[in-house]
Amino acid sequence: MPIYQIDGLTPVVPEESFVHPTAVLIGDVILGKGVYVGPNASLRGDFGRIVVKDGANIQDNCVMHGFPEQDTVVGEDGHIGHSAILHGCIIRRNALVGMNAVVMDGAVIGENSIVGASAFVKAKAEMPANYLIVGSPAKAIRELSEQELAWKKQGTHEYQVLVTRCKQTLHQVEPLREIEPGRKRLVFDENLRPKQ
């Protein structure tokens, strides 16, 4: 994986976390334990600190960056969907930012909230806890139901299990030239582990 030091600052990646080999971490990046960073994600701690706390996931093609001396933080069990952009913002514990959403400088997403796909959260916006946040510009439109909170928790758990799966079985290979006879499909047990 491309990990770069800049101005004497080296990214911190605990052994218990997984960073895909195509993700890029630069400078003042601090990952917690059990963090998943997906393919082609870019975490640039070359102006401000990037913090991803325990159990959070940063999915494929996400960008985390900020202005000089400005932290960008994802709280514990945070869930950042594919191609989201976080710039100098704070995502509180157990919040989800949907695919292609943008959260701008100084914005705060309250804990347990869900930012909908393609939402645009303006700079300095403060969004409440336990709310659905959608639109461009984004607005907190209603409280989340227990079912929605459970759905979010389950999705994040799937990525926490994926950390272990990747560390144990992900490796680069040459492709097959044709489908092998009896090709298996991924089928999961109640703990989200593939059945053998």
UniProtKB/Swiss-Prot annotation:
Q: Which SUPFAM superfamilies match?
A: Trimeric LpxA-like enzymes
User: Biological process (GO) annotations?
Assistant: phenylacetate catabolic process
GO MF annotation terms? acyl-CoA hydrolase activity; transferase activity
What stretches pass through the bilayer? none
| Cross-referenced Gene3D superfamilies | Hexapeptide repeat proteins
Q: Which UniProt keywords apply?
A: Repeat, Transferase
CDD domains reported for this sequence: LbH_paaY_like
Asked whether the UniProt record includes Cell cycle among its keywords, one would answer no
> So, what pathway does this thing act in?
Aromatic compound metabolism; phenylacetate degradation
The answer, when asked if Repeat is one of the entry's keywords, is yes
Q: Which NCBIfam families match?
A: PaaY (TIGR02287)
**Family of the protein in this entry:** Belongs to the transferase hexapeptide repeat family.
Tell me the protein's name: Phenylacetic acid degradation protein PaaY
What organism, scientifically named, is this protein from?
Escherichia coli (strain K12)
